[in-house]
């Protein structure tokens, strides 16, 4: 099982807000609303999709970001949820409305 650690600061810094496994089918509100700004993934499985949403019910009419894991890696940092990019490990897709970092109210993992 892989581990996803959500952080209060950008670049995987400051306090840990919440730690979860990469088990598919998760859909939850973070333990602290509007705190998360970045994440680190540890051994998260290929094909895992991590979604973070500004909307408390995970609606896509507000800011959201989807991280698709292309390849398992021992440790990888998602520095911000406000940038779309692709590398050998992840595809990150950010849809902007008025900003997402520090405003996350729903997390989905599949």
Report residues per predicted region.
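Compact beta-sheet-dominated domain cores in extracellular/mature segments
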Residues: 1-110
